[in-house]
Regions:
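Rossmann-fold cofactor-recognition segment
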Residues: 93-105
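Active-site Tyr-X1-5-Lys
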Residues: 176-205, 213-225
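NAD(P)H-binding glycine-rich loop region in Rossmannoid oxidoreductase-like domains
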Residues: 102-142, 173
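Conserved Rossmann-fold NAD(P)-dependent oxidoreductase catalytic core, especially the SDR/UDP-sugar
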Residues: 134-137, 141, 145-187, 202-203
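A conserved pocket-lining segment of Rossmann-fold NAD(P)-dependent short-chain dehydrogenase/reductase
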Residues: 132, 219-248, 252-274, 294-306
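N-terminal Rossmann NAD(P)H-binding glycine-rich loop of SDR-like oxidoreductase domains
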Residues: 50-78
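Non-catalytic terminal and boundary segments that flank Rossmann-like NAD(P)-dependent oxidoreductase
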Residues: 1-57, 371-479
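Mid/C-terminal beta-alpha module of Rossmann-like enzyme folds, strongest
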Residues: 256-356
Length: 479
């Protein structure tokens, strides 16, 4: 944003101070919103980690960043035979830097051949949602095809264990954001590799916002230094975990690889309540002792997420976790310490996944337009989601569709229109079972189908699906 006139800046600073005073008068802003988050931990299973690191050759991709630097320090404490960081930029601290870019398969192959890793941690990615929207092709090449290059290099080199750091944003069934979409395709490939028989055990973690490496805290600090902090809005929240939780998750995923379902991930149990960015900014401003103004810039592309109610399980049969969706919730499991929670990822048939990746690659080869590359990326995610849902229990699909699209809580037409792609992919996956000759005719299910038909009919472009849902209730009505 352009610099503000001095008078405007002074007015914002005065208004911000008055807002902070008012909130303190209500008993708010008394504690650092991040203090509790920074104290949380995931119990490190040190003995099991040591058995898989001591005396072995370890390679970290993207190890020059915040998480990678802390991870390398921890790995070094377990006395590996060698520690290599494959990254485009040099690092400080432990290990040897191997300059390389995971987008280049030849570079990745050469580095793996030269260093002969036995353990791999794959962290390299375009990790900021806003940046991914600005560098669409680079995000796809890095997060999607770079991950494929790492998987193939692990296979060729006979790596024993490989751990991938995914994102909690992958709990979304579908997305219209480049970052989430690219990471979902990376997850799908990693899980496919985990299911396949081969020399490598593939394991995965899902992170949420890592405090010490986070965009929000950094932008607030930078704004305080200039006297003006920009926020997306007054009522924005985000889940957080700390660097200790993130790195312990990675090491524990290595230690436990092979002890749970291969196509699963680990996350931290204790993520606390989401942090309000306005309260965080006001607390940090007060702590600085400087005159600082606040302004709301609006939610940029990549961060404008809407909550689809069917994303989470409302049955009360499973524990709620913000990084586990309703498809994954029934598969939950925990580690012995109770500080990690895991779940399985929906299976995409390998042929369908490969076909989606091939079509995406073909689209990238024929266009230089970011908007067209993004469209192809989102379509690939839709194809993978549709193929994954095709193998799911119809009753579960109906349950999720009911939670997300039933008239009681579906929201207005505009809200429903936003979720049309998600509703469509679930409805299309469910219909073959509903239209089968032996389809269940329980009154409760039929009532839900009739109600859903009404919801679908209200969404532009879904009239045909609504008609098919309505038709599924007719045999019972006739009886």
């Amino acid at each position: 944003p352009d610099p503000l006139p001095p008078a405007t800046l002074a007015a914002l600073q005065a208004g911000t101070a008055a807002l902070a005073d008012a909130l303190r008068g209500e008993g708010r802003l008394q504690e650092d919103p991040l203090a509790l988050a920074l104290s949380r931990s995931v119990e490190l299973q040190a003995e099991a980690v040591a058995r898989r690191l001591r005396g072995r050759r370890v390679l970290v991709t993207g190890g020059s960043g915040c998480v990678g630097t802390r991870l390398r320090r921890l790995i070094a404490g377990f006395e590996p035979a060698a520690l290599v960081n494959l990254d485009r930029v040099p690092h400080r601290g432990e290990g040897i830097w191997a300059r390389g870019d995971i987008r280049n398969p030849e570079e990745v192959t050469d580095i793996f051949a030269a260093t002969r890793p036995e353990v791999v941690f794959h962290l390299a990615s375009i990790r900021e949602p806003g940046m991914a929207e600005r560098v669409v092709r680079e995000a796809i090449e890095t997060n999607v095809y770079g991950t494929r290059n790492v998987i193939e290099a692990c296979h060729r080199a006979g790596v024993a264990q490989a751990v991938y750091s995914s994102t909690g944003k992958c709990y979304a069934y579908l997305t219209d954001h480049v970052y989430t979409a690219s990471k979902k395709l990376a997850e799908a490939q990693w899980m496919a590799a985990a299911r396949a028989e081969g020399p490598t055990l593939f394991a995965m973690t899902r992170f949420t916002h890592v405090l010490e490496n986070g965009v929000v805290a950094r932008e607030i600090a930078e704004g305080i230094a200039t006297g003006l902090v920009g926020l997306h809005g007054p009522d924005r929240h985000f889940n957080v975990q700390n660097l200790r939780q993130a790195t312990h998750l990675l090491l524990n995923a290595l230690a436990l690889a092979g002890q749970q379902a291969p196509d699963s991930f680990w996350s931290a149990v204790d993520l606390g309540w989401p942090v309000n960015t306005l309260e965080l900014a006001l607390h940090q401003i007060a702590a600085s002792g400087r005159p600082v103004g606040l302004r709301f810039l609006g939610v940029p592309c990549g961060y404008d997420e809407s909550f689809f109610r069917g994303q989470f399980d409302w049955s009360e049969r499973h524990d709620y976790h913000p990084l586990i969706n309703a498809l994954e919730a029934p598969t939950q499991f925990a580690d012995r310490s109770g500080t990690m929670i895991g779940a399985r990822v929906a299976t995409c048939p390998p042929a369908a996944l490969q076909a989606a990746l091939d079509r995406l690659r073909g689209s990238l080869a024929t266009t230089q337009e970011d908007c067209l590359a993004k469209r192809a990326l989102l379509e690939a995610v839709r194809e993978v989601a549709a193929a994954s849902l095709a193998g799911f229990c119809p009753r579960r699909l109906l349950e999720i569709l009911w939670w997300g699209a039933a008239p009681e809580w579906a929201g207005d037409t505009a809200q429903m229109l936003r979720f049309r792609p998600i509703i469509t992919v679930f409805a299309e996956a469910l219909l073959p079972a509903l239209e089968a000759p032996a389809a269940a005719q329980e009154p409760a299910l039929q009532a839900r189908l009739a109600a859903l038909a009404g919801s679908l009919a209200a969404i532009s472009g879904m009239e045909a699906l609504a008609g098919r849902f309505a038709a599924a209730t007719r045999p019972l009505q006739a009886a």
